[in-house]
């Protein structure tokens, strides 16, 4: 069930008692989630934990078995998928791709590409883009909606460390300039520590949630990802605090 107004009037997106079953199998069970303006929420979890199913439910591509998803009135959603497969034989430029399924004003296209760091690619062939360039074009396409909520489903999968870092820099810039909330599925756990306000660890149910350092020290998190990962996250968090102190 989708409602027009979240029960929590401060939230722009609200999920309550969400359950998704396929063929009698529980994919998601009793999921509760609130998303607030300009907040960055990250979903983490092992493969097959239901992360992508939750994202597809939020954008309306999957209908929940029970429960509700409520979005505040007039809130626009931008979506960046994990990967989009295009026929490499199609002679399609970035400009043509970003105008599908309908044309947008040229200035709007230019601004979206600029905000995504892809302005130099407007005449490039989609088939010739690198992985990082392709994802920036997908981000630009999502920004054409001028989103209040930006949802990313493992949008950096397959990118190298440099490409991943550059992509997340654009996401942070977009969050500030658009004032949007960001909900992202990520396997880049060190990025979670640097960028997320709130983390949900999903394994069919929400195993644990909270600030990144709270989740990293949770027994449920450590059971899924191991003590070594928690130590790595603590290391990144420590250096993040050092950077903030030096900046001050």
Write out the residue ranges for each language-model feature.
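ABC ATPase nucleotide-binding domains
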Residues: 217, 224-248
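Catalytic Walker B motif of ABC-type/P-loop ATPase nucleotide-binding domains
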Residues: 150-153
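Conserved ABC ATPase "signature" region
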Residues: 107-121
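H-loop/switch region of ABC-family ATPase nucleotide-binding domains
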Residues: 186-187
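Conserved ABC ATPase signature
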Residues: 125-129, 133
